[in-house]
């Protein structure tokens, strides 16, 4: 808790993103006080994400109601760190996962958060040495959403009423997929607008990476005086386009635009880069119904 508190200090050496390249911290089952402290991981740097679990290692199995109460508390703490006061953007670089289970084929017998599953699959999808997301390793939707490593889920069934309540609280849960398997119906951030693409865990992580790329572009061109403002804008945009080429498994359309505000022009030494990301919404709700006809009606068509 003491170490992670340094992320709230903008004078800490942890703000040196050239050397401290971490993007995400996973809650491995810390006590509540430490979970609260982990929320500060995203307080200063916009290239970071925190994934929290309701489970505490060594603690009792929680009920669905207890999971929900903890999720509300954790989401409230995360809301201390909005994305932008200027634009009024609420926090989205955080996620809360409920329930607990055991690790399959492991000597570690304590219960753990299903975040263990998320961490393993995220590393396999997004953790390559070249930084490119691996096609075929995504875990949004089956088969990737089906749990491979965690079993004996603490709350194996979540009713519709409870699911709606958990969703409103920003809580992710695990439920039955078939007779043998469980799955994540979705992995949503704590962002408070269900219609926004910022609800998606993967989209949020892409935005974290885009913030890293933008800072690398600044490091590359900082101090340049041999380019006109127009030439510099083109160079910065091309730098970003090259950096994102092939990175995100063809999931997004990304458009950088460097321009100069009136304040930039007056100063003469600054510019503004806007990076647009176009992403798909998560599919989470399906309405279905059955229509019955006479066979003769089919034959007639």
Please report, for each region that a protein language model flagged, where it lies by residue.
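Compositionally biased, low-complexity/repeat regions
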Residues: 234, 245-301
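A glycine- and small-residue-enriched flexible loop/hinge signal that marks low-structured segments
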Residues: 1-232, 239-260
């Amino acid at each position: 808790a003491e170490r992670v508190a340094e992320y709230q200090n903008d004078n800490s050496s942890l703000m040196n993103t050239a050397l401290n390249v971490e993007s995400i911290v996973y809650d491995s089952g810390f006590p509540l006080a430490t979970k609260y402290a982990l929320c500060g991981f995203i307080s200063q740097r916009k290239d970071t994400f925190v994934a929290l679990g309701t489970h505490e290692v060594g603690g009792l199995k929680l009920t669905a109601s207890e999971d929900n109460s903890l999720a509300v508390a954790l989401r409230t703490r995360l809301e201390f760190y909005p994305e932008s006061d200027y634009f009024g953007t609420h926090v989205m670089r955080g996620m809360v996962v409920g329930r607990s289970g055991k690790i399959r084929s492991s000597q570690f017998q304590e219960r753990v958060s299903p975040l263990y599953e998320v961490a393993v699959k995220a590393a396999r999808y997004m953790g390559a040495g070249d930084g490119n997301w691996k096609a075929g390793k995504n875990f949004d939707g089956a088969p990737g959403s089906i749990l491979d490593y965690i079993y004996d889920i603490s709350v194996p069934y979540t009713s519709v009423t409870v699911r709606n309540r958990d969703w409103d609280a920003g809580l992710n849960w695990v439920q039955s997929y078939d007779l043998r398997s469980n799955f994540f119906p979705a992995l949503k951030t704590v962002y408070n607008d269900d219609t926004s693409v910022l609800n998606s865990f993967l989209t949020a992580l892409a935005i974290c990476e885009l913030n890293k790329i933008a800072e690398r572009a600044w490091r590359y061109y900082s101090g340049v005086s041999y380019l006109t403002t127009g030439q510099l804008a083109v160079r910065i945009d091309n730098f970003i386009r090259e950096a994102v080429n092939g990175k995100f498994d063809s999931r997004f359309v990304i458009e950088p635009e460097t321009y100069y505000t009136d304040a930039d022009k007056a100063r003469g030494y600054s510019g503004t880069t806007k990076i647009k990301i176009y992403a798909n919404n998560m599919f989470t709700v399906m309405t279905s119904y059955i229509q019955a006809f006479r066979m003769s009606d089919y034959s007639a068509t």
